[in-house]
Amino acid sequence: MAFSLGELERLVAYQIGAALAVSTYAGHPIRYVKCHGALGQQTYHSAEIATAVCRAVKAVDPSLVMLSIARGQQDRIAAEMGLITKSEIYADRGYDETGFLVSRKLPGALLKDPVQAAERIVRMVREGAIETTSGAYLPARIESVCVHSDTPGAVEMAAQVLSVSYTHLRAHETREDL
């Protein structure tokens, strides 16, 4: 079912409002908004869809952080609208030459080896760039790393990414970084 941009904005605002109400009632208010799945991918590519989502967040609670796929439209638009933004990369997904996720139908779309995924994350953070399946690097802000829970071995991968990232990245910080 397709929605108009206005309908999308209102639906997102409603969902954020409901999530805020329930989470606040439970004593754990949400702090960020992340579009999931197809909507997240659409906010990466479409300035219009990203704008509708960002307008909804800004209207409901402009203090919420917008967690966006690195290098996408949503990240840029959220910043232009004065929202707090954080760019996210995926430990378990491959990137094409444009910096977007490789289709799950293609080879290289899903990374399954926890050690390789963790080492790649360290390289990307150090380079400040997304590593594509060809080995090229595309500049990107990297402030969050996601491991999809439905990836085989997701728990092990997340643990490995955390361990290797902490060990390798923390060891290279200077006193000014701390």
Placement of each model-derived feature along the sequence:
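Glycine-rich tight-turn/loop motif centered on a GG-T
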Residues: 1-9, 43-44, 100-112
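Glycine/small-residue-rich loop that forms an oxyanion/phosphate-binding "nest" at active or ligand-binding sites
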Residues: 1-25
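Conserved, mostly hydrophobic/aromatic
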Residues: 33, 147
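Charged helix-capping and loop-helix junction motifs
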Residues: 46-52
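Catalytic beta/alpha-barrel core
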Residues: 63-70
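Active-site rim beta-loop-alpha module in soluble metabolic enzymes
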Residues: 73, 77, 85-125, 129
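C-terminal helical cap(s) of enzyme catalytic domains, especially alpha/beta-barrels
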Residues: 154-166
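Conserved small/polar residues in nucleotide/adenosyl-binding loops
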Residues: 167-174
